[in-house]
Amino acid sequence: QVINFDELTTLIGNNSSGKTAALVALNTIFSENSGDRNLERSDFFLPKDKDPEELEEQSLYVEAVFHFNELQKEQGSTTYSIPTFFDSFVVDAPGHAPYLRIRLEATWEKSSNIEGSIESKVYYFTCPELEEITDEKKRIASRHDLNRIRMIYVPAVRDPSKQLKNASGSMMYQIMNSINWKDTTKESVKGIIQDLNDEFLKESGISILKDAIHDEWEEYHSDSRYSNAQLRFNSTNIDSAIKKAEVVFSPTVVEREYSIDEMGDGLRSLFYISMVDSMLDVENKIREEIESGEELSFSKTPPILTIVAVEEPENHIAPHLLGKLIGKLRDISKKCNSQTILTSHSPAIVKRISPEELRYF
């Protein structure tokens, strides 16, 4: 099956018609999370008239074809996106715009393992789509290069807290960890944090607790290594401090700020999509700095394209907010570095989508 994607594309159809399978297939190639890229036995198609026990081997492939609008329109900057994939471009004929073919190929074989053995590789295909594929036209695609195309997949059953916390691997952590901190800022923050720790330790109760921890540890541990146990309230370097950064909300019905964990499912889902939008804005600014040769605020090299795939955005969202949500998802799709894919069963969503942007499964 071939699916054509626009800037914003909405997949509709019955339950179990393949909408999620299409998104998971793309996620298997372009997810930043290595766990999402693992294939399972159930990913391979089982023909209706076949007994699974009779099968010795199966294969599958998923191919993604990318066109570069800046080349087709002969406008806009080409310095950022083109060099990464230049050697892998395909041109059908003289005067035609080049495009990129990326294909995941996988095989399953029966083995002593109860699930069988699965091998998969991702290739660049350097021949036109209508030509026969030969080994000479296949090149292994490195994960380093594939990371220039990223997919953010938001499933229908979602736990936004995992991404909203500044945990290792989250969007916010990746951005904050790549900030080019000035040396003077690092030293200043280190001094302020040390002063804060010293202020805590001036309290008699804290001092009693600190001494008890230190003295009892000496009784339990006789080795010179790790012998000095000290109570510390804040990390003494900026890298450790930013790991504890989080977004808080105010005003609230009580006299304190709320963390994301205290918000309802609907607000958490909305804020998660808002965070994706924010990170794409930041990455656009990073891209502008790189292309203009300015002093870089970040060491991160952002992806060329981010595919934002949201299943059933209507989940947990009040009906009167759906119009605004679809409007924001459409805004994301219009950014130069992103594309949006939705799935939905909701008439309130579908009526806000142009017929040309619908794909029926």
Q: Which residues does each predicted region cover?
A:
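Extreme N-terminal "head/tail" segments of very large remodeling/mechanoenzyme assemblies
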Residues: 1-15, 23-70
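Switch/communication elements of ASCE P-loop NTPase nucleotide-binding domains
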Residues: 1-31, 242, 250-361
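Beta-strand secondary-structure signal
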Residues: 2, 61-65, 101-105, 246-248
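Solvent-exposed residues in well-ordered beta-strands and their adjoining turns
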Residues: 6, 65-69, 107, 157, ...
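Non-catalytic alpha-helical coupling and interface elements of nucleotide-dependent molecular machines
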Residues: 17, 27-35, 69-71, 109, ...
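Glycine-rich phosphate-binding loops of NTPases
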Residues: 34-57, 70-194, 207, 257
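Short glycine-/polar-rich loops that comprise or flank the Walker A/P-loop
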Residues: 58-62, 98-102, 147-151, 304-305, ...
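Extended helical coiled-coil dimerization/tether regions that scaffold
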Residues: 160-169, 173-308
